[in-house]
A protein has these predicted regions:
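Hydrophobic alpha-helical transmembrane segments of multi-pass integral membrane proteins
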Residues: 12-18, 38, 42, 88, ...
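Hydrophobic secondary-structure block in the mid-to-C-terminal portion of proteins
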Residues: 138-180
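Membrane-proximal soluble regions of multi-pass membrane proteins
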Residues: 53-110, 167, 171, 175-180
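Hydrophobic core segments of alpha-helical transmembrane domains in multi-pass membrane proteins
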Residues: 32-41, 131, 143-152
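Cytosolic-side membrane-entry/anchor segment at the start of a transmembrane helix
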Residues: 1-37, 109, 160-173, 180
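Transmembrane alpha-helical segments and their cytosolic interface motifs
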Residues: 109-139
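Transmembrane helix interruption/hinge and helix-loop junction motifs
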Residues: 25-30, 135-143
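Hydrophobic alpha-helical membrane-embedded segments
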Residues: 26-78, 155-159
Length: 180
């Protein structure tokens, strides 16, 4: 997944670098929409890569799962059952599968990684709305609202997935700790 993200970002950058001068020269409305859409999508990909890198440098997958932020809330289990998370979670891609691989990592490390991944996606959700502030300067409200909102929803799925998996992992970790 990491290679696909980086490759997609490179292609978006090339597309933006090609479409922007064409729009500047022609002023064509269709090229403008294409340029704005590519530019905003490029922003979303670059921002994701940057947020993930920065949070990883700061946290190193060592978040405190006992923090109130990461603890399971009373409503969550019912909410996840309503969303049927168990049925679709296996189809969601992982940016860095080795981070969650039980043959390479301890359960405690994986729990820390779920906390960190949650933070990454929550920050991304907020930053996904930032392009909306550029609408008065760029126009393209429909394209910007659409890409920003869809981006936020996509990251909400990843937050849900981390929060869904963590309580089970914590229980496994606590059982291992009791055996020691």
């Amino acid at each position: 997944m990491k290679k696909k993200m980086i490759l997609t970002t490179v292609f978006l950058f090339i597309g933006f670098a090609i479409s922007l001068p064409i729009f500047i020269v022609t002023g064509n409305a269709i090229i403008e929409i294409i340029t704005i859409t590519i530019g905003v999508t490029l922003y979303h990909f670059l921002m994701r890569l940057a947020v993930g890198t920065i949070v990883n440098l700061i946290m190193k997958n060592k978040a405190n799962h006992k923090s109130i932020w990461f603890r399971e809330k009373n409503f969550e289990r019912k909410f996840y059952n309503l969303l049927r998370v168990r049925k679709w979670k296996k189809y969601i891609p992982t940016y860095s599968p080795d981070t969650f691989d039980t043959s390479q990592k301890t359960v405690k490390e994986i729990v820390g990684a779920t906390c960190q991944a949650e933070i990454v996606h929550e920050v991304i959700m907020v930053l996904s709305l930032l392009p909306i502030a550029a609408i008065p300067f760029l126009g393209g409200a429909a394209a910007i609202f659409t890409t920003s909102f869809l981006s936020m929803l996509i990251d909400a799925v990843f937050v849900i997935l981390q929060r869904y998996n963590r309580p089970m992992l914590v229980r496994v970790m606590e059982r291992f700790d009791k055996l020691k």
